[in-house]
Amino acid sequence: MKKKTNNKGTANLRQTQGPQTRNIILAILTGGLLTAAWPIWGIAPFIFIAFVPLLLLEGFVAEGERGRMFWLSFLAFFVWNVATTWWVWNATPAATLAWLLNALFMATVFWLFHLTKKKVCNNPWGNFILIPYWMAFELLTYHWAIKWPWLNLGHVFSSQVSWVQWYEYTGVAGGTLWVLIVNILIANILQFFKTKKAKPILINIGLEAIILLLPIIISTRVYKHYEDQGTDTEVIVVQQNCDPWNEQFDNHFYDQVIQNNINLSLPLVTPNTRFIVSSESAIQEGIWLHETEKAKALKTLHDYVSRFSQLSFVIGGTTYEWVPKGMEDDFPARHIDGTDKYYYCHNSALLISGDGLQHRNKSQLTPVVEAIPEWMGFLRNFSLTVGIARGTLKGDPESKVMTFDGHKVAVPICYESAFGEYVGSFCAKGADLIFVITNDGWWGDTPGYKQHFEFSKLRAIENRRCIARSANTGRSGFFNQRGDVLQQTKYWEPDAIKATLKANKEVTFYAKNGDYLSRIAVYVTFVLLITWIAKSFLDLGKNRKATKTTTRKKR
C-alpha cells in the first residue's frame, strides 16, 4: 500500500525555503557591496546602493518575524566587518572581538529601525527612520567603552576627496547622512514600483538625482579652486622602519632606533626646518615624567636639535608616572608587586626642542589592546601585549596642543586619527598643523595600514589643515588642506621626506561645532523610540480590549 504524499506540506516547505534563500542572498549582497566600496578597494560609488538589498529585505520580513530581521542584518554586517577589517587579527586575536561586537551593535540598530518602522510608519517613507538611528549609533562608536569608528560610513569617501570638500562643515557624519539618504531613495523607488503609483516614484527619482549629484558638483568646484592657506613651514617626516614584533621593543635596539631617526633626518635639515616628525612609540627606554632628565633618548634628541636654530623633534614614546595618593583604585593604575606603589603607563607624544620637553598622552585608546573596559577587567590577568600595551593605559581627559616657534601643533597618536571631532578639537584650540604619529607595522602588509593612511585625507579636509604623517613601518606622507597626498613613502622601507606645508590658523565650522549632525540624530532617535514604545502599549491595550469583546460575544 502506497503512503500518501503530503503535497501541501512539501509546497509550504518550498515556499518557505525560497524566501529564506532570497533573504540570505540579499543580506550577503549588502555585506559584499559595503566591502567593495570601502578603502582600499576604493569603488566608492557602490556605497550608494549597498544598503538597498537590506532595505528591500526589511520590507519582506513581517512584523511577527522580528528575530529573523535581527539575524539577517547581523549576517550582512558581520560579512562587512570581517571582510574589511580581517587584518586586526595580525595585531592580536583578542581585537577581533570588534568584528562580533560591531556586527551585533549594527544589527541591533537595524532591528530597532525595523520594529519602529513597522509600528510608526509601515511604508517605504518609513525607511527614513534608519537615518537618525544609524547616525546616533555612529556617534556612540566614538564615546562608549569599546570605541570603533573605523567603519563609520562617511569614512568611505577617503578615496574620493573631490566629492566631500564640504566635510569642513559636516565632518564624516555628513557623508553618512548622504549615503543613507541616497540608499533609501533608491530602495523607495524599487518598492513604489510594486504599487504602480507614479507620483511617489517620480518624487523619489527627482530627489535622488538632486541629492546624489548636487554635493558632488559643489564639492568638485570647491576642490578645483581651493588653495592652501597660511604661512610656509618646513617639516621633515621620518619613517624609521623598525620591526615592532622583533626589534622595536627589544632593549638591545633602543639606542639604534634613536640613531636611525637622526641619520635619516639629518641630510634633509636646513635652516628653515622647524619640525622633524617621527613615529608612535619610538622611544621605549621607559621615561618617568618626574625625572625626564634621566632619559638617554631625550638627551640625545635634545642635543641633536640644539645644533640648529629653531628646530624641534616630535616623536612617540612610552612614559610613566606615579599614581597620586587616593587614586589607587583608578582602573588604569598598575601595582608594583611587593610595594604599596602604583603607577600609570602612557602612550605619549613628545616635542623636544631647545626650550625643553612637552608631552601629551593618547586619549582615544585602542579597545582591548590599550584600553580594557572595567566590565572586562578579567582580561588584565592575561598577557595581551602589543607593543607598549598590556592591560589599560592612562589617557589624557582631553586634547592638548603643543607649541613651538609661534606654532600650535596637534599630534594625534595612531588610532586617534580616526576620530574626526577629537582631531578637530586640537584645531579649535589653535593648532595650525597636524602631525599624525603611528606604528602601523603590527598589521603587516594588509589593508589595515592603507585604510589608516586614507583617513588622514578626511582630517585634512575637515579642519583645512596640512598634515604630516609618520608611520614606523606603514606608510608616511604629507597631505594638503584639500586632502591630496603630496608625498608618500613605500611600505617597510626606511626613509625621510621633506615638504613645505601651510600652517593655517583659520578654524572651520566643523572644528568649532564637532559632530552636531549626529547629536541632532540622537534627539530624533529618542523621540522615535518614545513614539514606538507608546504606540506599542496603545496597540497592546487595543488588542486586549478586542480579545475581551470577542470572548464575550462567543459566550
State what each model feature region is.
Residues 220-367, 401-405, 411, 415:
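Soluble catalytic regions of membrane-associated enzymes that act on cell-envelope
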Residues 88-91, 140-172, 299, 334-420, ...:
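Active-site catalytic loop in hydrolytic enzyme cores
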Residues 38-55, 80-82, 239-240, 272-289, ...:
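Short, conserved active-site loops that position catalytic residues or coordinate cofactors/metal ions
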Residues 383-413, 504-545:
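Cysteine/selenocysteine-centered motifs that mediate thiol-based redox chemistry or coordinate metal-sulfur cofactors
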Residues 211-270, 439-452, 457-464, 468-469, ...:
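Non-cytosolic juxtamembrane linkers/loops
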Residues 2-226, 445, 456, 471, ...:
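Membrane-embedded alpha-helical bundles of multi-pass enzymes
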Residues 132, 275, 281-283, 291-315, ...:
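CN hydrolase (nitrilase-like) catalytic-core segments centered on the catalytic cysteine
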Residues 544-555:
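Cytoplasmic C-terminal tails of single-pass
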